[in-house]
Amino acid sequence: MTLEITGSELIKSKLIDAPERSGVYRMFDVNKQVLYVGKAKNLKKRLTNYIKSNLDNKTLRMIANTCFLEYSITNSEVEALLLEAQLIKKFQPKFNILLKDCKSFPFIKLRLDHDFPQLLKYRGKTLSDGKFFGPFASSAEVNTTLTELQKIFKLRSCTDNYFNSRTRPCLQYEIKRCYAPCVGKINKEDYRDLVTQVKDFLQGRTKELQENLSRKMEELSSQMRFEEAAEIRDRIKALSYVQLKAGVSDVVKDADIIAIVEKNGHYCVEVFLYRAGQACGNIPYFPTSTENSTKEEVLEYFLLQFYQKQHVPAAIIINHEINDKENVIEAIKKINNILQINITVPNKGGKAKLVQNAETNALFSLEQYLKKFAKNQEIMFEIKELFGLSEIPERIEIYDNSHIQGKFAVGVMVVAGKVGFDKKEYRVFNVHAPSLVCHSRESGDPKRLMDSCFRGNGIKNCGGDIKGDDYEMLRQVLTRRLTRLRQEPHKLPSLMIIDGGKGHLGVVKEVMDKFEMNIPFVCMSKGVDRNAGFEQFHVIGKEVFTLDKNLPVMKYLQILRDEAHNFAIKNHRLGRSRAIKISRLDDIEGVGETRKKALLHYFGSYKAVCDATIYELAKVNGINKLLAEMIFNVLHRKN
């Protein structure tokens, strides 16, 4: 494809028809990948800024790579802000300030659609039926709180299927973490009283709760019911301990405390969550592509991206003003379909102290991040020199596979970046029989392979049998990966590392030539006696070489290889385990797909099916007593 004009000349040509209205513009590279999304109060004036002479290096690089430019007119600045945020979220442009690893925060959910409500962890932005408490900064925070609640209040945490199938109390009852309502160890009224206590605690009404419990304890004591009174006493003590450990604020009830700090062009945004006056944890974020950006710009982009995924509290308290606060508030309200939010910057008082504490934590987090970044950059520079790369690598992909004599075969890809492993970019590839691969290669349809086999983390099916052919496995994996890279050229790796030797090197070159790609790659094989520290490196056009096992770069390469190896084994075991489970049910005459689904739906999991008695199995729709006995015998026979 020949482009007539690019860069600043392209922008000049677009200025002729650019309107003096609010809107959003998009810059694309030669592959039509979005480089940058920007908003403007006046599109013509904003685009004019890109042809001035005093531009920073980041902007100059962006303009130099711009081959296409499009813009959309909006009815208002708020609409432009909304559209910009949506497009950034969708395309993740290289030159935009991006908030990475922003998973939705978990909640504690109290189900209210059952006679005996269940406490569980919930993650997701859209809150379904039930009572929700949180959010919490991490799963660890939720799990810790749930454990404490189970110790204190002993509400059930099991699924409905498990609850309905019980004929005797489970282990949770034995270790005093559940009152076993499934088998009638507690009546509905007493259980409902416990549910009310849990609500009071999670909503911050701990003082009233403790007063009520104290009155109840005295009442029980006066009735000579000392054992029950002692249980209430222990509950009061446990509540006091949990409250003290969690940290309670009298200053804010429902708020996010957000502080931004900067050092050497890098930013950290620390978020502290407070709900019902209780601290629910904190988490640091490190926005990318912040070169030559101001605190105001970074914080504005952070808020817009953060609150596309997270629950919006009553108050958002920040440590730095943003330029377009009113429009940002309106955009967040529209994104979340809410009527009111409050963004403030306190100068004194208790809120200012909370912000100062968040800022102190942000500085510490940023210093730790920069130390890790600097150390990683040193290693990346050594890798560049070692393998003769044109630039310091920003993305390294490492490949490995795992199988047992060709069965349950999976290939994996792990990714390392500027500050370590990027786990959301990890991929698992189901490896299928050679006949499928050969057919697809002959038909020249690598997309079919990609569509059917390329997936994210997790096992779709249990893998194929490829007769232990490591080369064929690698050929499949790379075919799928390079097919995907044709669609995602912005994810082209700086280097590929393959766990393998000279033969694997030839396979990689064959696939690269087929796709007419020139990605640098190296094969890393076990050395003498397969001992760590004696690895051999195979590069096209070079003799096989080794490295001193004490060199930092050697240790780093071993870490990369081991991460891929462990990820491959983990997913191979998942596939094998799933296949074995499925095959044991498949061994039972009279149990087809419908009955398998009925069993799993009724009991909730394969393990629960295995734990069920003959009487419990016979309760499932479509399973009579004779078939229940057959299922029980097959699942419990010794191999």
Curated annotation (Swiss-Prot):
Main location group: cytoplasm
CC per GO annotation: cytoplasm; excinuclease repair complex
Compartments in which it is found: Cytoplasm
InterPro entries: GIY-YIG_endonuc, GIY-YIG_endonuc_sf, GIY-YIG_UvrC_Cho, RuvA_2-like, UVR_dom, UVR_dom_sf, UvrABC_protein_C, UvrC
GIY-YIG domain mapped to chain residues: 20-97
UniProt record, GO biological process: nucleotide-excision repair; SOS response
Record's signal peptide: none
Chain ranges passing through the membrane: none
Keywords from the named record: Cytoplasm, DNA damage, DNA excision, DNA repair, Excision nuclease, SOS response
A GO molecular-function annotation: DNA binding
A Pfam family hit: UvrC_RNaseH_dom
UVR domain boundaries: 207-242
Annotated NCBIfam families: uvrC
Family per similarity comment: Belongs to the UvrC family.
Annotated function: The UvrABC repair system catalyzes the recognition and processing of DNA lesions. UvrC both incises the 5' and 3' sides of the lesion. The N-terminal half is responsible for the 3' incision and the C-terminal half is responsible for the 5' incision.
Entry-linked HAMAP family: UvrC
Subunit and partners: Interacts with UvrB in an incision complex.
Name the record gives this protein: UvrABC system protein C
Upper taxonomic lineage: Bacteria, Pseudomonadati, Pseudomonadota, Alphaproteobacteria, Rickettsiales
